[in-house]
């Protein structure tokens, strides 16, 4: 806020005042001359206690001269700095001198000289001195603020100069042996500890008509307010209101306004903002701010004045956030509205007659600040009439149109774009409060026409240089974004006049067209803003179509297609943080408002596997979506075609929809703290649905129009929705359920019975608490209902036990089958191992081989048919030269030496081929060979 130019201007003015003050002062300057040059860097020994004792004495001849002489010696002694160890005594001497000023004016000079010493560095002999003498130092510096009560202009100015020098520390002029300078921030810290800021704030009230001293005090407070500690102290001392009420005090230099605004800024930033706003929210402060702002607005032409004007407006905007601030009563609201609109809507008001804003940076910022303050002011409903009188809607709509080639109102293209976006954003807050004015300005038509331009291919290079222009550089996304926000705000008023007008102008078709156009041209660079635009379009469509069948029919299959497109979004993107979650919420809302209740749209949604997509999202197990999706599915289940789609769905690991819903039920009960055993079985048959919340909060009598805890539980969790869906799917024919699912399903099936019993139990308990005695018949009925509810719980628990036991038996049987299969596998492996051992024995031992051969031949012979039929052809079982110990035949495969090494299993036999190619190594088969003298034989069939 404090720019270099402003600072230079202020310092120049301050310098003039300082020179003037110095010239008018009658106090002679004491020149300290040291007699011994070698001793300049060494403190002369001085008994400070003697000086104090001397100053405390009274009624002696020549005492005043002696006292003044000793004080002068003290000043000479400490001309290069003040040791921390002596600081308490030096300030006690200063206090004694100040006490004598009223009756002995000559002590003004002594006090002045000692105060001047405070501008010198504080010196420490030990490193620990800063800590050791911290309390004495803080109390000493605090004394400077108390001395502001002395009615001496010179002393007050010197005190202020001394404090300002704390923030501009200079090294000591001479090095003092044995001493070193305290840290540069030590004085500032001690000023905070001593509470100097409080006494300086209080001193403002003593300087009502002393402009020079007041400016110096403000300069001190300006420096002090750079610290959060000091700002807190100043805030508690009511500095904000005290300074603000004097903003309009006469000051030719202009420093008063500049320094005051700087202090107010620091107080708002570095102390309790709410408390400072509360201090400024009074009629006197607001009138002062109003007068200052109006004067600067009408007569401020320099860069410095315009910047100061904007700073005052920002402070005013912050105050306006307090609904208790009398902005309307002081007339400030009316003036601000006038200043915000006079460029767009011509006014004959004398305040703005002949005024014109330039395209300078300060005036451009002013325009944006005025738009912003309108948004703040419109939150106070009494402001509405002033907004109507000021024609704010009409003024803002002058920006809602495509840019023209010539400059508009002198703004550059970049400035106009930013103001355009700011104006549309302001309309989003103001227009919903002024529906009649919005409609009289043809607001819907203007916005829709502007959206057409946003969607068109007209050449346009946006600058995107502002907060509102984020994501819109080189395109029209920013304009489209804020226009859709405006439409969304108007649609969600649920005003039938506005919504009907929108539908008659083809808004539904236009929104669908914009959406389809956006998804046809993916833009990953501006993905976040594109997602926001898509979300707003879906919300607008939801607001227009809700409870209107005809509008849902207009939404139709094209609308369903864009919904399905969003539903197919990669689930991993939901965690990206770009806005996919919001888009999915908007999509689910549009399913509820635009599709449900319109049978053609419902059927088309089902045909395009919309239920599958809903269940896919539900399977992601994200709690924020579950409630809404289940509510949609409850409504969809009224369509007779839905059940088949739900039952046909399969998730990961072949999970069915019924299994998914039951899993969600178990998860919900776990979060609610419902008591179940490890198998999911009911523990308390009297309270089978009780949550931990219901257990903690005892039943209390409630009025008849207040729902009880049991009733509220129905709407506050998803159990009722799951019960409704499974009921419509038929509890008896749910596919893909495990035993655990069936145990849970027993509870779900009886949910309504349990809930009714729970409510009757609440009624019974309330009667007891109110000490009412029902008649005998009613009492018996209540007891019968309670008993029946408990019996249902016992029956369900019994059924759950049967299911658990049956599953346990089934598990045992399955385990036995698996064990039998394992045994068979082991036995087969043993037989294979034994066969392999026999094979190894035959191939490694000739006797064993011969024995096996004999056994083979014997087995073959035993298997022969002994009565041979006539004309039968005899086939030998042996092939000569075949060295195998297994039955030979055309389909026998023997795992032995590879065929490529031995020439095949028949290479050495009598029926081997007569001509074989020699390729080196073993004999190889060939595809075509000529058989020599091969007898032709008929093959028996």
From Swiss-Prot:
Any single GO CC term annotated in Swiss-Prot or TrEMBL for this entry: cytoplasm
GO BP term (any one): spermatogenesis
Keywords: Cell projection, Cilium, Differentiation, Flagellum, Olfaction, Sensory transduction, Spermatogenesis
Cross-referenced InterPro entries: ARM-like, ARM-type_fold, CFA69, CFA69_ARM_dom
Cleaved signal peptide residues: none
Compartments where located: Cell projection, Cilium; Cell projection, Cilium, Flagellum
A Pfam family reported for this protein in Swiss-Prot or TrEMBL: CFA69_ARM_rpt
Primary site of residence: other
Biased composition (Low complexity): 1-10
Region (Disordered): 1-23
Function recorded in the entry: Cilium- and flagellum-associated protein. In the olfactory epithelium, regulates the speed of activation and termination of the odor response and thus contributes to the robustness of olfactory transduction pathways. Required for sperm flagellum assembly and stability.
Protein name per its UniProtKB record: Cilia- and flagella-associated protein 69
């Amino acid at each position: 806020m404090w720019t270099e130019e402003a600072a230079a201007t202020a310092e120049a003015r301050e310098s003039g005042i300082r020179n003037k003050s110095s010239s008018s002062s009658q106090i002679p300057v004491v020149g300290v001359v040291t007699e011994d040059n070698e001793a300049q860097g060494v403190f002369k020994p001085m008994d400070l206690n003697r000086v104090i004792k001397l100053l405390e004495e009274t009624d002696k001849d020549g005492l005043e001269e002696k006292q003044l002489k000793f004080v002068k010696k003290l000043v000479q002694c400490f001309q290069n700095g003040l040791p921390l160890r002596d600081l308490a005594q030096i300030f006690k001497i200063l206090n004694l001198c100040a006490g004598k000023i009223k009756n002995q004016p000559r002590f003004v000079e002594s006090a002045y000289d000692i105060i001047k010493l405070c501008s010198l560095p504080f010196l420490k002999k030990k490193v620990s001195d800063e800590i050791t003498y911290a309390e004495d130092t803080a109390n000493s510096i605090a004394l400077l603020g108390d001395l502001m009560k002395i009615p001496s202009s010179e002393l007050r100015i010197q005190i202020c100069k001394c404090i300002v020098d704390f923030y501009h520390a200079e090294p000591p002029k001479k090095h003092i042996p044995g001493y070193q300078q305290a840290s540069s921030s030590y004085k500032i810290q001690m000023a905070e500890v001593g509470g100097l800021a409080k006494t300086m704030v209080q001193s403002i009230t003593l300087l009502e008509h002393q402009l020079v001293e007041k400016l110096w005090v403000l300069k001190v407070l300006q420096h002090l307010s750079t610290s959060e500690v000091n700002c807190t102290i100043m805030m508690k001392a009511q500095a904000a209101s005290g300074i603000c009420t004097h903003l309009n005090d006469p000051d030719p230099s202009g420093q008063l306004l500049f320094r005051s605004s700087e202090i107010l800024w620091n107080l708002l930033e570095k102390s309790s903002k709410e408390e400072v706003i509360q201090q400024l929210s009074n009629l006197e402060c607001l009138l002062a701010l109003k007068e200052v702002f109006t004067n600067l607005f009408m007569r401020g032409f320099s860069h410095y004045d315009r910047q100061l004007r904007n700073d005052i407006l920002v402070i005013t905007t912050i105050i306006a956030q307090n609904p208790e601030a009398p902005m309307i009563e002081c007339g400030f609201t009316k003036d601000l509205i006038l200043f915000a609109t006079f460029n767009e809507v011509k006014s004959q008001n004398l305040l703005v007659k002949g005024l014109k804003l330039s395209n300078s940076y300060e005036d451009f910022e002013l325009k944006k600040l005025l738009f912003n303050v309108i948004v703040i002011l419109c939150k106070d409903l009494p402001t509405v009439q002033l907004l109507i009188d000021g024609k704010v809607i009409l003024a803002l709509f002058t920006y809602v149109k495509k840019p023209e080639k010539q400059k508009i109102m002198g703004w550059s293209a970049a400035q106009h774009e930013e103001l355009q976006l700011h104006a549309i954003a302001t309309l989003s807050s103001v227009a919903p409060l002024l529906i009649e004015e919005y409609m009289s300005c043809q607001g819907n038509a203007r916005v829709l026409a502007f959206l057409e331009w946003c969607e068109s291919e007209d050449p346009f290079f946006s600058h995107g240089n502002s907060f509102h222009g984020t994501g819109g550089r080189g395109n029209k996304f920013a304009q489209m974004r804020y226009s859709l926000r405006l439409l969304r705000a108007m649609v969600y008023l649920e005003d039938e006049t506005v919504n009907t007008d929108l539908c008659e102008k083809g808004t539904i078709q236009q929104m669908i067209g914009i959406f389809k156009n956006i998804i046809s041209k993916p833009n990953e660079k501006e993905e976040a803003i594109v997602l926001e635009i898509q979300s707003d379009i879906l919300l607008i469509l939801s607001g227009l179509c809700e409870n209107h069948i005809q509008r849902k029919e207009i939404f139709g299959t094209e609308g369903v297609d864009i919904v399905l497109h969003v539903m197919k979004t990669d689930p991993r993107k939901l965690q990206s943080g770009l806005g996919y979650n919001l888009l999915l919420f908007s999509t689910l809302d549009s399913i509820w408002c635009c599709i449900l209740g319109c049978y053609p749209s419902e059927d088309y949604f089902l045909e395009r596997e919309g239920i599958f997509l809903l269940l896919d999202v539900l399977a992601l197990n994200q709690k924020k979506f579950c409630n809404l999706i289940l509510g949609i599915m409850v409504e969809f289940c009224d369509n007779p075609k839905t059940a088949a789609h739900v039952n046909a769905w399969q998730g990961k690991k072949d999970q069915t929809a019924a299994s998914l819903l039951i899993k969600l039920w178990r998860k919900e009960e776990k979060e609610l703290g419902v008591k179940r055993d490890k198998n999911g079985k009911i523990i308390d048959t009297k309270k089978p649905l009780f949550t931990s919340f219901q257990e903690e909060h005892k039943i209390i009598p409630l009025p008849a129009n207040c729902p009880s805890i049991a009733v509220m539980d129905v709407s506050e969790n998803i159990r009722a929705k799951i019960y409704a869906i499974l009921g419509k799917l038929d509890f008896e024919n749910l596919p893909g359920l495990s035993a655990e699912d069936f145990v849970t399903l027993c509870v779900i099936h009886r949910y309504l019975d349990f809930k009714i019993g729970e409510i009757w139990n609440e009624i019974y308990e309330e009667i007891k608490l109110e000490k009412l005695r029902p008649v005998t018949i009613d009492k018996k009925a209540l007891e019968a209902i309670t008993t029946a509810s408990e019996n249902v719980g016992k029956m369900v628990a019994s059924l759950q036990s049967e299911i658990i036991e049956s599953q346990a038996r089934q598990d045992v049987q399955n385990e036995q089958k698996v064990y039998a299969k394992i045994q068979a596998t082991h036995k087969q492996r043993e037989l294979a191992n034994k066969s392999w051992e026999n094979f190894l024995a035959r191939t490694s031992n000739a006797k064993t081989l011969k024995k096996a051969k004999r056994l083979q031949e014997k087995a073959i012979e035993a298997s022969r048919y002994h009565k041979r039929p006539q004309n039968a052809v005899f086939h030998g079982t042996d092939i000569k030269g075949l060295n195998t110990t297994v039955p030979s035949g055309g389909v026998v495969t023997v795992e032995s030496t590879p065929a490529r090494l031995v020439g095949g299993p028949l290479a050495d036999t009598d029926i081997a081929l007569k001509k074989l190619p020699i390729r080196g190594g073993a004999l190889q088969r060939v595809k075509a060979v000529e058989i020599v003298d091969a007898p032709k034989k008929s093959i028996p069939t």
